[in-house]
Design a protein with these regions (language model features):
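Juxtadomain coupling helices with adjacent low-complexity linkers
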Residues: 145-153, 160-161, 177-241, 401, ...
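Amphipathic alpha-helical effector-binding/dimerization core
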Residues: 63-146, 305-389
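N-terminal helix-turn-helix
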Residues: 1-73, 226-307, 463, 467-474
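Short, basic/aromatic recognition patches
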Residues: 78-92, 136-168, 196, 208, ...
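Sensor-regulatory modules in signal-transduction proteins
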Residues: 170-173, 431-434
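A structural microfeature
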Residues: 51, 110-112, 179, 345-346, ...
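Amphipathic alpha-helical regulatory segments at dimerization interfaces
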Residues: 13-16, 31-32, 46, 82-93, ...
Length: 474
C-alpha cells in the first residue's frame, strides 16, 4: 500500500462515522486499518498539515479537517439541492425514512438521509455502514437498469428483522451505479406504506438521475480542454499527499482524464496517473466505463453532511449565545427534518421582566409555524415548495409562505410575526454548508415591541450570526 493510499484510508476512517467531528485516537485508527501506531501517527500528522484532519481533544486524537469538509461539499454541490428535494418529497409521500447510500472499496455507507418523524421508525443515519447480503441496498448496488425487461420493477426489497427496505440503484450516464436510494419502514406499517414506498423510490430515482444527466450535459468531459494549472510557487514540488489533495479537489468539480487532471493541477502526467491510481485504491476515485476519465466517488458526499450538525452544536452555540445576550433576544439554530423545523441550538434570553420563552431544543415544529421555516426551504422553487407543503394547510397559507420564501431569497433575511404566538416577532437568515446549500436557519426571537424597535440592528445581527455559523461549515 502506498503512502497516499494509506493516508486517504485514514481520512476515510475518520470521516465515515456518524459524527466525524468526534475525537478518534491514532491507536483506534491503526487498529481499524491493521497498521502500526507509529506509521499511522506520522501520516495523521501530515494529513493535519494539509487540512484533511485536525487535532481533537485528548492525547493523539484527531477529527475531520476543514479541507476534507470543503472537498466533500464541493463534490456534492452539483447534486445537493436535487438530492435534498427528492429525499424530502419521498419522505413526505411515505412518512418513512428515505436515504442515499454510496459505496467504495468494498464498504457502503449512508451519505444523505431524511428520517421518519414517527415515534417508532427505522433509522438511517449519515455515516452508518450498510452491509449484509440480504439487504436490498447491498443487492441494488450490484445492479443497474441495463438489460432489465420493461416489466421488471426498478427496485429491490428485503426484510431484515423488523425493518423492510425498498431500494433502487442511482445510475450515471455511463450505466454505472453511483449510489443507492432506499426507504426503510417497520414491518408493522407495510400494509399502510409499502406500496407508497415503492412508488416514492421509483419517482425519487428518476428525479436524482435527471439531475445527474443535466449536470453532465452542462459540464462535459474536460480531457480536451482542461483549465489552466492551479497557482503554485515556482519550483514547488508538493508532497504526495498534498498533490493527491490537488487531484481530489479538481475531480470534485467534474470528471477528467489523466492529462487534463495533470494540466489542471500542475503535476506531471506520470505523477498524476500514479496518484489517481492511489486515490482509486483508497476508494475515493472511480474510473469511467471506458477508463479514459476519472471522477470522485459519491461516498465523499456524506462527510460534510455528517459533520454539519455536531459542528453547529459544538462551535455554533457560543455564537448564538453571544448574539442573544448582546441583543437581549432568544437565539436559535434550526434545521429541516422532513418538512418540520428542528431546533439544534437555543439560548433563551428575553426582553421584558417576568417573561419566559418555552424551550424548543430537540423538538420539531411544523414548518408553516416555524420561525425559520421559509428560510430553510429558500433554495427550492415555488413548485417544489408547493409539492412538499403539507396537504392539511390551505392555499392561502401556502401563498403567504411562498411570499416569505421569495422575500428571504431576495433580501437574505426575513422578519415576520409569529404564525400562532401573539406578541412575538422572529428574524431569520440562512446558514449555508460546504455545498453552498441552506442547511439551517439562524433565528432571533423576541417580543413585538423589542424587535420592531430594533429591526434594522437585529436583522444585521441575524445575518452576521448566520455568516459566522456558515464559516464553521466551509
Amino acid at each position: 500500500m502506498t503512502r497516499v493510499t494509506a493516508g486517504l484510508k485514514i481520512v476515510r476512517v475518520v470521516a465515515e462515522r456518524r459524527d466525524p467531528t468526534a475525537p478518534l485516537t491514532v491507536g483506534a485508527i491503526a487498529r481499524e486499518l491493521g497498521a502500526s501506531v507509529s506509521a499511522t501517527s506520522r501520516l495523521c500528522s501530515e494529513l493535519e498539515s494539509i487540512g484533511l484532519l485536525e487535532r481533537a481533544e485528548g492525547y493523539g486524537a484527531y477529527r475531520l479537517g476543514r479541507e476534507a469538509v470543503r472537498l466533500s461539499g464541493a463534490a456534492a454541490a452539483p447534486f445537493a439541492r436535487s438530492v435534498r428535494f427528492a429525499l424530502t418529497l419521498a419522505a413526505q409521500q411515505t412518512g418513512e425514512t428515505v436515504f442515499l447510500v454510496a459505496g467504495a472499496a468494498g464498504t457502503m455507507r449512508v451519505v444523505a438521509s431524511v428520517e421518519s418523524l414517527w415515534t417508532l421508525h427505522s433509522p438511517a443515519d449519515v455515516g452508518e455502514p450498510v452491509s449484509g447480503g440480504q439487504s436490498a441496498v447491498v443487492r441494488a448496488a450490484e445492479r443497474s437498469d441495463a438489460g432489465l425487461d420493461a416489466a421488471e420493477p426498478r427496485y429491490l426489497e428485503s426484510t431484515v428483522g423488523m425493518t423492510i427496505e425498498v431500494a433502487a440503484p442511482i445510475v450515471g450516464p455511463g450505466g454505472e451505479c453511483v449510489a443507492v436510494l432506499a426507504v426503510r419502514l417497520p414491518v408493522n406499517r407495510a400494509d399502510q406504506n409499502l406500496s407508497r414506498a415503492r412508488h416514492a423510490v421509483a419517482a425519487a430515482k428518476r428525479s436524482i438521475e435527471h439531475g445527474i444527466e443535466e449536470w453532465h450535459a452542462r459540464v462535459p468531459d474536460r480531457g480536451q480542454s482542461a483549465p489552466p494549472a492551479v497557482p503554485h510557487a515556482p519550483g514547488e514540488t508538493p508532497t504526495a499527499l498534498a498533490a493527491a489533495l490537488r487531484i481530489l479537489r479538481h475531480l470534485a468539480t467534474g470528471r477528467d482524464s489523466v492529462s487534463g487532471t495533470a494540466r489542471a493541477t500542475g503535476l506531471r502526467p506520470d505523477r498524476a496517473q500514479r496518484l489517481i491510481d492511489a486515490c482509486r485504491r483508497a476508494g475515493l476515485v472511480w474510473a469511467g466505463h471506458d477508463r479514459s476519465h476519472y471522477q470522485l466517488g459519491w461516498i465523499v458526499q456524506g462527510w460534510y453532511r455528517a459533520a454539519a450538525a455536531p459542528t453547529m452544536v459544538e462551535r455554533g452555540k457560543p455564537f448564538v449565545a453571544q448574539t442573544a445576550e448582546r441583543t437581549n433576544t432568544c437565539g436559535f439554530l434550526t434545521t429541516l427534518k422532513g418538512m418540520r423545523s428542528f431546533t439544534l441550538v437555543e439560548e433563551l434570553e428575553m426582553a421584558g421582566e417576568g417573561l419566559r420563552m418555552s424551550p424548543w431544543l430537540g423538538r420539531a415544529h411544523p414548518i408553516i409555524g416555524s420561525d425559520g421555516g421559509p428560510t430553510l426551504v429558500m433554495d427550492l422553487d415555488d413548485d417544489e415548495v408547493a409539492r412538499l407543503f403539507p396537504a392539511r394547510n390551505t392555499r392561502q397559507e401556502l401563498d403567504v409562505f411562498l411570499r416569505r420564501v421569495r422575500g428571504v431569497a431576495r433580501d437574505g433575511v426575513l422578519t415576520m410575526e409569529a404564525f400562532d404566538d401573539a406578541g412575538i416577532v422572529s428574524i431569520s437568515a440562512p446558514v449555508r454548508d460546504a455545498s453552498g446549500t441552506v442547511v439551517a436557519a439562524a433565528c432571533l426571537v423576541g417580543t413585538t415591541a423589542h424587535m420592531r424597535a430594533n429591526t434594522v440592528e437585529f436583522e444585521r445581527e441575524t445575518r452576521d450570526l448566520a455568516a459566522r455559523v456558515s464559516s464553521l461549515l466551509d
